[in-house]
Structures are given as structure tokens and as C-alpha cells.
Design a protein with these regions (language model features):
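Thiamine diphosphate
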Residues: 1-134
Length: 134
């Protein structure tokens, strides 16, 4: 209990995507289909955090992209930032999620695009991070 599941990991990977729920499968499929050197982590437990894994990502100097389709405030990314702050580590972190604003009504696809939490936005950030290591 409290251990997250890691997919497509390799010591030469410099980018990790942390997410949860059904999006993990879609993210992993896109990573594999595009042969991206990206680790995908299913953060299936918010509490407790998998601190051992988070410490390992920081020790490996990985860019960490936290992808959640919920509010950023009080979510997975907030918990991870708090943990890193507590251990005084500052890894490269990008958070993708819903900002603290009013969200209009519409289809899930439309709202994800409107809030920039769709997979295209995520993978634009992934490619941006990978280019830093070329």
C-alpha cells in the first residue's frame, strides 16, 4: 500500500509524467506509440505519497510533469510540492491541471481543451522538456 506503479522506466530517462486514473493508460499508450524516453507513473494513492519514489526522481534530476484533470490547488501536485519543500529539494516540476477559476459548462473534450489539460497540451510540455536534454 502506498507504492505507485512505474511504467517504461529507464535510468537514461530524464522526464517523468505523474498522473492517476484512466488517463494513465492513455498517457502510457501515447508514450509507447511515439517511442518517447519518458517514465510514466500511476500515482494511485494520494495519501500516503510514495516518498521513496519521489526522492528517487529528484536524485535522478528528472523533469517531473504532474498531470491531473482536477483543481491544482489541494491536488496531487500540491502534495508533491509540499513534500519536496519539506526535504528542501527543488526538482524541475511542471503542473498541469485546472487553475483556480470558474469553469464553464461543456463536453469533457471541450473543457479539457479550454483548461489546457488535454493530452495534446501535456505532450507539448513533454516534448519541450525532452528537448532540454538533447
Amino acid at each position: 500500500i502506498g507504492k505507485w506503479t512505474t511504467f517504461n522506466d529507464s535510468l537514461d530517462h530524464k522526464v517523468a509524467i505523474l498522473s492517476y486514473g484512466p488517463d494513465v493508460d492513455r498517457i502510457l499508450q501515447k508514450v509507447m506509440n511515439n517511442n518517447l524516453k519518458v517514465t510514466v507513473i500511476n500515482c494511485r494513492f494520494l495519501k500516503p505519497l510514495d516518498k521513496e519514489l519521489l526522492k528517487d526522481l529528484a536524485d535522478r534530476n528528472m523533469s517531473i510533469i504532474i498531470y491531473e484533470t482536477d483543481m491544482l490547488a489541494g491536488g496531487l501536485g500540491s502534495e508533491i510540492l509540499e513534500y519536496y519543500n519539506d526535504i528542501q529539494v527543488k526538482p524541475d516540476i511542471i503542473r498541469i491541471g485546472i487553475k483556480d477559476n470558474y469553469v464553464p459548462q461543456g463536453s469533457i473534450k471541450l473543457l479539457r481543451e479550454y483548461e489546457h489539460i488535454d493530452l495534446n497540451t501535456l505532450f507539448d510540455k513533454v516534448i519541450e522538456q525532452l528537448k532540454k536534454y538533447d
